UniProtKB/Swiss-Prot annotation:
<protein>
    <recommendedName>
        <fullName>Mpv17-like protein 2</fullName>
    </recommendedName>
</protein>
<keyword id="KW-0999">Mitochondrion inner membrane</keyword>
<keyword id="KW-1133">Transmembrane helix</keyword>
<dbReference type="GO" id="GO:0061668">
    <property type="term" value="P:mitochondrial ribosome assembly"/>
</dbReference>
<keyword id="KW-0472">Membrane</keyword>
<dbReference type="GO" id="GO:0005739">
    <property type="term" value="C:mitochondrion"/>
</dbReference>
<comment type="subunit">
    <text>Interacts with the large mitochondrial ribosomal subunit.</text>
</comment>
<feature type="transmembrane region" description="Helical">
    <location>
        <begin position="105"/>
        <end position="122"/>
    </location>
</feature>
<dbReference type="GO" id="GO:0005743">
    <property type="term" value="C:mitochondrial inner membrane"/>
</dbReference>
<dbReference type="InterPro" id="IPR007248">
    <property type="entry name" value="Mpv17_PMP22"/>
</dbReference>
<keyword id="KW-0496">Mitochondrion</keyword>
<keyword id="KW-0812">Transmembrane</keyword>
<comment type="similarity">
    <text>Belongs to the peroxisomal membrane protein PXMP2/4 family.</text>
</comment>
<dbReference type="GO" id="GO:0005737">
    <property type="term" value="C:cytoplasm"/>
</dbReference>
<comment type="function">
    <text>Required for the assembly and stability of the mitochondrial ribosome. Is a positive regulator of mitochondrial protein synthesis.</text>
</comment>
<dbReference type="Pfam" id="PF04117">
    <property type="entry name" value="Mpv17_PMP22"/>
</dbReference>
<feature type="transmembrane region" description="Helical">
    <location>
        <begin position="25"/>
        <end position="45"/>
    </location>
</feature>
């Protein structure tokens, strides 16, 4: 049983928490959570890389780039889910399936390109180089996307209120973002291992 002071504390916290999911603050919440989860996924992936490659240090600029690219995706995702909910009204199974299909066919490749192009250019590559990397890794990325996101989005569109959609995706995406960091930086890590003679 929670004490009276505990209940008062929770009510106070809820008072600060609720505005983050309403009105103009919702887009800020969605934007920052998107960047934060992409950065967290990169931190997890870098921790794995450091454990596998002794002497390797954490690349904070890489994590900062992940945060920036994630924040740039936040507004798109915010308005994308609003559009899906406006165009496919309700959470009947037919509409949910349509939302998932449109999300997979439109948003997934768009956000994949956004991620690879944004990260590539922030890491100092030319647009052409970033575009080539996306082309080289697209099918691996897209097949993995189809394995993860349709089921996650079925839950999202069927059970959750619209204001929590981006936050839910950002929480589920922690594992996905770790994978994206791995996929994006895999070649760099392999080159570093070979140069150090640890491959």
């Amino acid at each position: 049983m929670i004490s009276r002071q505990g209940k008062e504390f929770l009510v106070r916290i809820a008072g600060y928490w609720k505005p983050l999911f309403r009105g103009r603050f919702l887009i800020v919440t969605n934007t920052v959570s998107c960047g934060g989860m992409l950065a967290a996924g990169d931190l997890i992936q870098q921790t794995r890389e450091i454990r596998r490659t002794p002497g390797r240090t954490r690349d904070w600029s890489r994590t900062g780039c992940m945060f920036a690219v994630g924040c740039s995706m936040g507004p798109f995702m915010h308005y994308w889910y609003q559009w899906l909910d406006k165009y496919f009204i309700g959470n009947g199974i037919n509409n949910v399936c349509k939302k998932v299909l449109v999300d997979q066919l439109v948003a997934s490749p768009t956000l994949g390109a956004w991620y690879f192009l944004g990260m590539g250019m922030m890491e100092g590559h030319t647009f052409i180089e970033a575009q080539q990397e996306f082309r080289d890794k697209f099918w691996e990325f897209y097949k993995a996307d189809w394995c993860v996101w349709p089921a996650a989005q079925m839950i999202n569109f069927y059970f959750l209120p619209p204001k929590f959609r981006v936050l839910y995706v950002n929480i589920v995406t922690l594992g996905w973002d770790t994978y994206l960091s791995y996929l994006k930086h895999r070649d760099t890590v392999e080159v570093t291992k070979e140069a150090d003679g640890t491959a």
